[in-house]
Regions:
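Amphipathic alpha-helical coiled-coil/heptad-repeat segments
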Residues: 1-339
Length: 339
């Protein structure tokens, strides 16, 4: 019970960190608390003993006890390891950027070792209630059967700073924004304001990051389409181009996520080793820096196939904090099974 209380506290602290109102200092304090709690968790797992035998480090296995009045009336018992390197196993998978709009029919395979679960079809397009946001919602509706949860990332970041340009007939998702004179780095905010003025119609919100690059985000997960002359200079997208985003999956155990289908989006291929990222992780792995391959699988925001550098430890980032919440929940499930 004490270990379960520790895991509950870790999850609470991860939840506190999973919002951008936190500062670097406050997240550092939360991460330090989590590391201390994990040390306490491991201390219990490594030192709890009975009659000289360790009970919670994984060595108490296949032990036999006499329970009846006659010989050989016995019962065998094993207690799994409860240290942080053995609990919290969680599977993270992130697709590569999807490139085609289509109807997506998806089936998760062998979710319980035997049965398949079909997900309701979703249309990936620029319409309201469509896109990979709708697909993620459909996946989450059957998560009680599959054990798989989905999130999406439809954020497009320009590869270079906004240039000075005069754009014509600019439109997003079929909504006309018009002609616009744009300053370098959108210094006067004209471009961002023009896009955000119609964000309730397009579903797309704009901002400029610290490098002067345009950031376009679909809040409800619908796809984005762009049109206009010279828009590549200011938003980094060509005339009559589109952007769909990527899908992220998590399972609260270490098993691979198998699927088939995906229609023209080729979603099942997008999660393969050819562009997708997959990795299983235990609780102890979040104490230090998050390896760049693991960060990619966790769905850290990126425009390229892979993240190029390691990420800050544990709850030091928003995405890391959300991953720690999943890992802590998985660890709680493991301990519930052991009890």
């Amino acid at each position: 019970d004490e270990q379960l209380k520790i895991l509950d506290t870790i999850k609470v602290k991860a939840t506190q960190s999973a919002q951008d109102g936190q500062t670097t200092d406050s997240r550092q304090a939360l991460q330090a608390d989590i590391v201390r709690l994990m040390e306490e968790l491991d201390n219990i797992g490594n030192t709890t003993s009975f009659n000289g035998q360790q009970l919670l480090n994984g060595t108490f296995s296949n032990k036999e006890f006499q329970i009846g009045a006659y010989s050989n009336q016995t019962v065998k018992a094993s207690i799994g390891a409860t240290t942080s390197d053995k609990i919290g196993l969680t599977r993270f998978e992130s697709s590569k950027l999807l490139t085609k709009m289509d109807v997506v029919s998806l089936t998760f395979l062998n979710v319980d070792g035997v049965n398949n679960v079909k997900v309701a079809a979703a249309t990936v397009s620029t319409g309201l209630g469509k896109g990979i946001g709708a697909l993620a919602e459909n996946i989450n509706k059957v998560s009680d059967k599959t054990g798989i949860r989905a999130t999406y990332d439809v954020t497009r970041i320009m590869s270079k700073a906004v240039e000075k340009a005069s754009i014509q007939s600019f439109a997003i998702n079929g909504v006309k924004i018009g002609d616009l004179d744009v300053q370098a780095n959108d210094a006067n905010g004209a471009l961002v304001n023009a896009i955000n003025r119609v964000k309730d119609q397009t579903g797309v919100e704009a901002s400029i990051n610290t490098e002067g690059k345009m950031v376009l985000t679909s809040r409800d997960g619908r796809a984005m389409s762009f049109a206009g002359k010279d828009i590549d200079k200011v938003i980094g997208a060509k005339d009559k181009s589109g952007f769909i985003g990527r899908l992220n999956l998590v399972r609260l155990d270490g098993r691979d996520i198998k699927m088939k289908g995906g229609g023209g989006t080729k979603l099942s291929v997008a999660f393969s080793s050819d562009g997708g990222a997959q990795q299983s992780v235990a609780m102890r792995d979040i104490r230090g820096q998050i390896d760049k391959k693991l960060a990619t699988a966790m769905g850290f925001q990126r425009m390229k196939a892979d993240i190029s550098s390691n990420q800050s430890a544990g709850v030091m980032t928003l995405r890391g904090a959300m991953a720690v919440m999943d890992i802590a929940e998985s660890a709680q499930k493991t301990l519930d099974q052991i009890r």
